[in-house]
Amino acid sequence: MSSFQSSDSRVSEELRTISSNVRQLSDEITKLRPQQGGSISIVECVDRALAGVFQTLGDVRGLLDRGRTLSKQAKILSGLNYDERPVRYESIPVAHQNMFQWAFQDLQENSEKPEHTDARLMTWLREGSGTFWVSGKPGSGKSTFMKFLADSPNTASALRSWASKKAIVIATHFFWSAGNAIQKSDEGLLRSILFNVLDQCPDLIPKVLQQMWARAGANQEPYQRPSSSPSLTRSELETAINTLKTQLDLPVRFCFFIDGLDEYSGDHYILEAVSVYGGQRLRVR
């Protein structure tokens, strides 16, 4: 909502500037009318004032277009999001500060023991590709570890080595068998991944969700807070993921952290569709 309010305020300011410029133009013309032989000065004054007005009008048009874009983006992100999405994540306890620091030990400390999980994890974050799996007994803290990794600045730092000059986008999903249907389904997974990615990269929305983008713009006034969001079908969610996978020339790289696969009740080909990602990596346990 703050984006809409900010843009609306800027438009109001620009409109006040236009009014001021028009009044100034009127005043200048009034002053010059009594002058003899002042026609050239009048024309020059009018040209300068009108140039300022037209520039301001162009700025306002740009702001209006930006407002429409922000409104459409908000509609679509609202349509992807769902109330239960953060529930499982928020229920997982935060790890003690030093509990999992072993995961970020320098590789040199484990050079003689390459089989260690921490060494392999750091290698994967910095240089690897494909899927890195973490397994363990029920109640052993796997979800807490996953939450810790996804949130740790050390993870982002290691991924930057892999991404080189590209930006890093981290997306997460936490399956939950104790939750409702969407919290343990592939629909929840697809919505979470798409929401996380497009919330951080909103400029991708028109490419990834073309039909939804068109529907979101129907009869939409600038700066109108979205009252309803376009609905997505299962087919559209799958198409969006597949479309995202084809965007290989992006200035970003993605890392997905998916927790609780043993609590997943959907079709496993969806997991394969998400994980087989050209030039990207998926992080699951």
Identify the role of each PLM range.
Residues M1-R285:
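Conserved NB-ARC/NACHT P-loop NTPase core of NLR-like innate immune receptors
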